Amino acid sequence: MREETAEQPAPLRSGLTTGSCATATSLAAARLLLCGQVSDAVEIVLPKGKQVQMRLEFCRLVDNFAEAATLKDAGDDPDVTHGALVFARVRLQAAAGVRFLAGAGVGTVTRPGLVLAVGEPAINPVPRRMMTEHLLQLAEEQGYSGGFEVTIGVEGGEALALKTMNPRLGILGGLSILGTSGIVRPFSCAAYIASIHQGIDVATTNGYRHIAACTGNASEDTMRRVYKIPDIALIEMGDFVGAVLKHLRRVSVDKLSVCGGFGKISKLAAGHMDLHSRHSSIDLPQLARWAADVGADAGLQQQILAANTSQQALAMSAAAGVPLGDEVCRHALNFARSIVPASVQVEVFAIDRQGGLVGQAGVDSQREIT
């Protein structure tokens, strides 16, 4: 019999950001205007010096402007913009420099707190710099002393943006043009973590001193019920609680409420800052020890050790009158406090799959939580 060989998964493929797409398409359109050159591909230089070639879907003259488009290729990253058509429309202008406009599918900033001013198109600083550098270099090569008006759009971007954090951040009408390196690293989650930071920045800039970081929809609903907290102060952190806790070292708030499913809160209690199953797991022996600390007898501890899920361990404890949920929240609270500044009041809530509270710590004992 032939020996089995270890499976060797293919390496994940990197992609290119919407900022790279915008740079390539704006350069191709500008080159058509200045040189009369129609391109089916264009080469750009990424911020760290790497040269990449990007294929164009079209490059054409339309009235008094040129436009070009490319399909966003995010590689193996599950990016909402993967496969979207990113386009640039470029007009020549008398004034030197580059003026950016939001086309269809690209959002506009409507709230303070982001790196872009209110009213600006949601084209982030690095993509702006990439486009500006490429366009000014082209102008110098062609002896052109004027400037460029650049409109960036994403086909279907307004609908795609509803699947992102943009509406909550006050970026309305479409997507953001993003990227710091020009490259999308598969499953790096850099964009998601950046949106968490932006959410905190927007909330605090707009005067909210109490934010609630939630793992999902059910925990957000719980925080709305407990505090009637507005959406702008609800931070959709998913599994990235560490992104919230570390950012509060740089951004000041008075109070942080953390709310999530019992299983995820138990991971936080064990000192994990990425709560996804790829990076952390439920520690049943630890749950059994914590249960023992609040009254679980040897029999219940053995049941917890044999449990299939954290929810089952919680249910067993509740049936025995053992407040495992509160104890887990207490440990999660202590860990969170070890990360954020001492000036931040922290509280932790754990919920079941129906959104009911099953544990809490750091909560004002004078206030009834239902």
From Swiss-Prot:
Broadest EC class assigned to this enzyme: transferase
Pfam families the UniProt entry points to: CbiD
Pathway: Cofactor biosynthesis; adenosylcobalamin biosynthesis; cob(II)yrinate a,c-diamide from sirohydrochlorin (anaerobic route): step 6/10
GO MF annotations in UniProt: cobalt-precorrin-5B C1-methyltransferase activity
Keywords: Cobalamin biosynthesis, Methyltransferase, S-adenosyl-L-methionine, Transferase
UniProt family annotation: Belongs to the CbiD family.
The protein's name in its UniProt record: Cobalt-precorrin-5B C(1)-methyltransferase
